[in-house]
Swiss-Prot record:
Keyword Electron transport among record annotations: no
A cellular-component GO term for this protein: extracellular region
Function (record text): This peptide evokes transient hypotension (-11 mmHg) similar to that evoked by 0.5 ug of bradykinin, when injected alone into rats. It has a high bradykinin-potentiating effect (113%), when 60 nmol of BPP-10e are coinjected with 0.5 ug of bradykinin into rats. It inhibits angiotensin converting enzyme (ACE) activity with a K(i)app of 16.21 uM.
Organism: Bothrops cotiara (Cotiara)
Protein's name according to its UniProt entry: Bradykinin-potentiating peptide 10e
Keyword Secreted part of the UniProt annotation: yes
Compartment(s): Secreted
Length: 10
């Protein structure tokens, strides 16, 4: 998925 935050797993 395309998350807004870079600290979360894809």
């Amino acid at each position: 998925q395309n998350w807004p935050s870079p600290k979360v797993p894809p």
